[in-house]
């Protein structure tokens, strides 16, 4: 980058993604609100493909890397003699702060009240004088900005490249289905359940299977089964609660 500053990169990604989100919402998504949800989903998938190929054509497909700042480099001792990366702890902390901030925004502010009302009955809130289009644009900007921030933070662990968010897309849908559509609490609990289930499956299953088979086969099979556990969890929750853990009936 021009400055090499990690913190400016985070800020720039947040602002840049929010601006892009506003433009996409105004130009494309706003025209689809009165249509079926499937049309909206298909349109956003088409946008993913178009934007990915556009970025690849303009900037190339070479991955870019962010340097972790010195203050977040290295590891820190935790309980039970566990050594953990400072930067990963930083990501966890930022995630928790964002979750708390979103919860307070939705439940404790006038904007949050309008967002919830607009979700339930857009005609009613429009009749009360609230500009529902502006409200949706704000929501889209917040979501896009947070997505950009997340991409920048993960770029210091992996790399920033075209399609880096696509593997997360399916997991995001799983989190929403498990937690319940429209629930901030559900999204938070669902993301924790998915993360813990995936980690336990990938870490403990291979070690357990090594007791019964060759280490190489155990590692491969354990990782595969670990990935399946997320979808098994989703299926079980949907059987018991079709609307998700905190979704509306």
Predicted regions and their residues:
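Helix-loop interface residues and adjacent transmembrane-helix termini in multi-pass membrane transporters
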Residues: 3-4, 34-35, 108, 119, ...
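Transmembrane alpha-helical segments in multi-pass inner-membrane proteins
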Residues: 3-15, 137-147, 151-231
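Alpha-helical transmembrane segments within multi-pass membrane transporters and channels
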Residues: 4-47, 54, 189-194, 198, ...
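Hydrophobic core segments of alpha-helical transmembrane domains in multi-pass membrane transport
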Residues: 14-20, 47-55, 94-103, 144-147, ...
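Transmembrane helix-bundle core of multi-pass membrane transporters
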Residues: 31-32, 37-108, 135, 203, ...
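Amphipathic alpha-helical segments that mediate coupling or scaffolding at interfaces
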Residues: 31-35, 118, 152, 176, ...
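Helix-loop-helix "hairpin" substructures at the membrane interface of multi-pass membrane proteins
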Residues: 81-164, 184-189
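Short, charged juxtamembrane terminal tails flanking transmembrane helices
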Residues: 243-249
């Amino acid at each position: 980058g021009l400055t090499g500053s990690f913190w400016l990169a985070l800020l720039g990604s947040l602002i840049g993604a929010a601006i892009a989100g506003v433009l996409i919402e105004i130009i494309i998504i706003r025209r689809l609100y009165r249509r079926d949800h499937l049309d909206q989903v298909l349109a956003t998938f088409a946008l993913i493909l178009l934007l990915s190929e556009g970025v690849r054509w303009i900037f190339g497909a070479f991955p870019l890397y962010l340097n972790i700042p010195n203050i977040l480099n290295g590891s820190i001792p935790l309980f039970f003699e566990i050594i953990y990366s400072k930067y990963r702890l930083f990501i966890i902390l930022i995630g928790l702060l964002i979750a708390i901030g979103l919860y307070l925004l939705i439940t404790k502010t006038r904007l949050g009240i309008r967002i919830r009302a607009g979700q339930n009955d857009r005609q009613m809130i429009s009749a009360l004088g609230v500009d529902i289009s502006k409200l949706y644009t704000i929501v889209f900007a917040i979501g896009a900005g947070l997505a950009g921030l997340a991409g920048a933070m993960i770029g210091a662990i992996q790399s920033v490249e075209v399609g880096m968010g696509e593997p997360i897309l399916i997991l995001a849908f799983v989190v929403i289905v498990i937690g319940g559509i429209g629930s901030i609490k559900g999204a938070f609990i669902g993301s924790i359940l998915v993360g813990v289930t995936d980690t336990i499956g990938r870490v403990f299953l291979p070690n357990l299977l090594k007791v019964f088979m060759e280490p190489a086969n155990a590692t491969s099979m354990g990782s595969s089964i670990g990935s399946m556990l997320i979808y098994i969890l989703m299926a079980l929750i949907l059987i018991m609660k079709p609307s998700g853990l905190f979704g509306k009936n």
